[in-house]
Design a protein with these regions (language model features):
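Detector for Asparagine
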Residues: 9, 18, 27, 80, ...
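PEST-like, low-complexity acidic/proline-rich intrinsically disordered segments
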Residues: 1-13
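Helix N-terminus capping/helix-initiation residues
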Residues: 64-68, 154, 159, 289, ...
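Fungal eukaryote-biased detector of long internal structured cores
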Residues: 85-278, 282-286
Length: 440
């Protein structure tokens, strides 16, 4: 087991630019403002989505060290491919993708190895004016239309085979959609069938897909485990890849912790199936201590490679710093589920790759409802522990610059999640998830 890195041996990422640098750029000619001067919009709603989310994305790209041409490239992607798929403004369809119900979220990923700067990411549930109506009650049509468009424009490496495979297995039929409200607890709030995510990398976009198999399984009177196990074995029989052993370990442990349910999320990469990861998400309502978290991270000793154990040392430090139990009561919207004080609810995902018998865990600390500045300062402490001194020093001011009209010391809805995973290739792999439109 290797001890956590200190400043002398840590892998230093490119630090975020500080808030004052960004303010100067915004007062001048930032890519967002230069584009906005000449862009036209077919509807007022698209213009509003652009004016509310575009500046946040632009600031994140600047702060994360993207070259100027890349900033223009990804803002143009946002204008052309994301904004037209966000539907009415303000939105009238609530997504299960985000805590706020917003159809879009931004995140920034940091890793010890393998990248020159942090990576900005987008998550989105495509929608339109028919979403949530009797014409498309659970918003199935816009996702399919979005994928068709990305296939047409020739995104490098894009492959929709896994969507074509999983969509009919996990998405609800018309008849099943009509049964959700009466047969699923809280069914009127379980509206999302699928979502997209984009990593904005130097080499281009890397796309990921998500579905919610739990509702389909319940309505079809089958278990989530058997539904996914059958699919994994079928893909192997087709010669698409072999995830069988890693999935069996994952499924056994999820059964052990009673982690099957409506909340389960399933994810893949939009690449050739043999190259894709699969991700399975589950939820624990209270993780009382680091011993339990260590069990979750290693699937109760089903995955204890040197890499897993090294990651566990970093996770232990992060647990101590974030201290969910000692953070008090969350300030959440009245209609949101309020976790009891002094509990540690956690989201987890288990990632499996073809040919690798071991799953790898990712832990998500839910920060929504806690003071944003306090959360950001805790995250900065973890960056400092990793030896990312420049990033740690600039981080609070930079996050404040993402939301210039809000005082982080007085808000509790702008920072959603902090995730942590660890691999031999990337080292610490951690992402912070943010509200994409602080005005909603």
């Amino acid at each position: 087991m290797t001890a956590p890195a200190d400043e002398s041996n840590a892998h230093e990422t490119v630090p975020l630019q500080n808030g004052s640098d960004l303010k100067e750029k915004r007062n001048g000619s930032s890519p967002y403002h230069m584009l906005s001067t000449y862009l036209s919009f077919p509807t007022r709603e698209q213009e509003q989505w652009w004016s509310q989310t575009g500046p946040v994305l632009g600031r994140m790209l600047e702060a994360s060290g993207y070259a100027l041409d890349q900033q223009f490239q990804y803002l143009t992607l946002h204008y052309n491919q994301i904004v037209p798929r966000l539907g009415p403004y303000p939105p009238n369809f609530r997504s299960n993708l985000t805590v706020s119900g917003l159809l879009i979220e931004f995140s920034i990923n940091y890793q010890q190895k393998g990248t020159n700067h942090p990576t900005v990411r987008l998550g989105v549930e495509p929608t339109d004016s028919f979403s949530g109506t009797e014409r498309d009650p659970l918003n199935k049509v816009p996702l399919r239309a979005a994928l068709n468009q990305f296939e047409r424009i020739g995104v490098k490496g894009f492959d929709s085979q896994l969507y074509t495979y999983f969509e009919p297995k996990h998405a609800l039929t018309r008849e099943e959609q009509l049964r959700v409200a009466t047969e699923i607890p809280g069914g009127d709030k379980r509206s999302t069938q699928g979502a997209l995510a984009f990593n904005l990398e130097d080499s281009g976009i890397n796309m990921k897909g998500y579905t919610y198999p739990g509702i389909k399984a319940h309505l079809a009177h089958v278990e989530v485990r058997s539904m996914i196990t059958e699919a994994i074995k079928d893909l192997k029989s087709q010669g698409k890849g072999d995830w069988v052993e890693a999935w069996a370990k994952t499924a056994d442990y999820v059964t052990e912790i009673n982690g099957w349910g409506f909340h389960n999320l399933w994810g893949w990469d939009y690449v050739d199936p043999s190259l894709s990861r699969f991700k399975f998400y589950t939820w624990q309502f209270d993780v009382p201590d680091m011993t339990k978290l260590g069990e979750l991270f290693t699937l109760n000793n089903r995955a204890t490679s040197p890499t897993h154990l090294e990651g566990l040392t970093y996770l232990h430090k992060l647990w101590d710093i974030i201290d969910l139990k000692g953070s008090g009561k969350r300030e959440l919207p009245a209609d949101a589920s309020q976790p009891p004080e002094n509990t540690n609810p956690m989201l987890l995902s288990y990632e499996i790759k073809s040919g690798n018998p071991l799953p790898y865990a990712k832990v998500y600390f839910p920060l929504q409802g806690f003071n944003d500045l306090a959360c950001v300062e805790k995250i900065a402490r973890f960056w400092e522990h990793l030896g990312w001194k420049g990033l740690a020093e600039s981080y609070p001011a930079t996050v404040q610059s993402f939301f210039p009209n809000h005082d982080l010391s007085k808000t509790s809805h702008l920072v959603y999640w902090l995730s942590f995973s660890y691999s031999e290739k990337q080292g610490v792999y951690s992402s912070v998830y943010y509200h994409a439109n602080a005005e909603i």
